[in-house]
Amino acid sequence: AGYIYVIAHIRGGSFLGYNWYLDGKMSNKINTFKDFIRCAEYLGDESNKYCDPKKIVIEGRSAGGLLIGAVTVMRPDLFWITIPGVPFVDVMNTMSDSKIPLTTEEWTQWGNPNEQEGYNNIREYCPYTNVKENHYPNMYCTAGLHDPRVPYWEIMKLIAKIREYKKDNNIQMIRIETEQG
């Protein structure tokens, strides 16, 4: 009995240098999610004996919440519980609206979905865009009612869509912090 705590240094983070960061940015953003999925697959591989694949719990906040939301939708079979905190999960719609604060500045990180290449890249990993009929893990999500950067309705839209398409009885919960943001 016990637990294992793992930190995955996936591409897009700068811990392993500038090139590692660039390998997870813009048209390479999908690498971030693929790296995380590979880590989860490795941990849950029965031959490694690290953990029961049905008991993997993952957590991330803000842009890390995007990571958690994306891998939840891409490979829901890998996780028992996912905890996206104030997650940026409707990348396509948010990045399409240049009137939202910081959007145009963030195009250098995520891409501009108003251009074909940016659209194609974001389409590949945007959690909200990619929900389909599937079995989804239990989810505990948080958002700040007054958060100007990651509005609470992004996670509410995602959870509503997952509930519409899910083929299981797992629970998706949202906690809205009314004093946060």
Predicted stretch roles:
Residues 1, 7-181:
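Active-site-proximal cap/loop segments of hydrolase catalytic domains
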